[in-house]
Amino acid sequence: MRKNRIRILHVAQAAGGVERYIRMLLKYLDKEKFENILVCSQDFREEDYDGLVDSFEQIELNRAIGANDLRSIVEIRKLVKKYNPDIVYAHSSKAGAITRVADIGLKNHCVYNPHGWAFNMRCSDKKRMMYTAIEKIAALFCDKIICISDAEKQSALDKKICREDKLQVIFNGVDIESYESGARGAIKRRDLNIPKDAFVVGMVGRISPQKAPDVFVKMAKQVKD
């Protein structure tokens, strides 16, 4: 039963970092205010979302661009009509492109999070131009684009993906519950020969503008001070 909650339909193709983001978002969204539906690829496992989503739908979503994308667009459009969400939230470049096409003309707010622009990946100039063109066209069919760093927003502006007022920076959160166990930290200090009284900071991620290592350095300094 909906009970006047805001209904969000998430669409995701890529697992990995995108899935970790989605799981944490679903974990901390107020379930009294939000109803969550997840439409995802075969890379996701339904049992991992017990208690996190109200509905779980799995469809064929391939990473590579191909003829099957047309089928995916049709399936996503059917599911959007079925659930009639208030918000459609597309995660990552591939799901973002086909979801925005699938949602054309439907009455909801469409939000897209690239989780790192495809045109910033290491690829040929031809592919980079294609990815940029796709993002520019698809940007016409959503209400907001979430950028996970200031660098990602600036990259969109540099490529003229859309108007600045369509871009919103929302930094990724950290699920501190995963790091509250002091025992694991002590083991790592021992394994790495780190003194017990040493102040330790760390970052997991590529050293690239998309991961905003500059933000981490500033944050680490503030924590230490």
Label the model's feature ranges.
Residues 75, 180-194:
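A short helix/loop element that forms part of the nucleotide-sugar donor recognition site in Leloir-type
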Residues 90-96, 114:
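Short His-centered aromatic/hydrophobic patch
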Residues 6-72, 151-155, 160, 166-169:
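N-terminal strand-loop element at the rim of the active site
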Residues 67-74, 109-111, 119-141, 154-158:
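Nucleotide-sugar donor phosphate/pyrophosphate-binding loop at the beta->alpha transition
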Residues 7-9, 104-120, 135, 146:
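Active-site proximal beta-strand in glycosyltransferases
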Residues 19-24, 199, 203-222:
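A conserved mid-protein helix/loop that constitutes part of the nucleotide-sugar donor-binding site
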Residues 12-15, 172-173, 203-209:
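Conserved donor-binding loops in enzymes that form glycosidic bonds
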Residues 141-166, 174-178:
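A short, active-site helix/loop in glycosyltransferases that binds the activated sugar's phosphate group
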